Amino acid sequence: MPTTYFHNPRCSKSRAALALLQARGVEPQLVAYLEQPPSIAELGTLLRQLGMTDARALMRQGEAEYKELGLDNPALPQEALIAALAAHPRLIERPIFIHGERAVIGRPPERVLELL
């Protein structure tokens, strides 16, 4: 079954979760999402795979960009939130491990093992 990993090599949690997968023989396709941001369509699929209905659940709400862009406004439609994630990939929570049709955010890193 294909596996994909949205990875930020500068993030300790991302490195730790990847090491857990590799220790179990899993070599996922790595996506450097900061350099290659997912499209709006890909983000929609990712939200479904994560079982999320609110794009804010995928956002790093502590990032300065979150407030600067007004993403804390509860009146914003989901489409606007997803577009913001595509345009500002630093806002995407990480790491994300995709195994088949399911995905999980690796926080704590051990969560990635739930899909194996």
Spell out what each predicted region is:
Residues 1-20, 28-33:
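Local sequence-structure signature of Cys/Sec-based thiol-disulfide redox active-site neighborhoods
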Residues 24:
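Conserved dinucleotide-binding and phosphotransfer motif residues
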Residues 33-116:
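Thiol/selenol-based redox catalytic cores and closely related redox-interacting motifs
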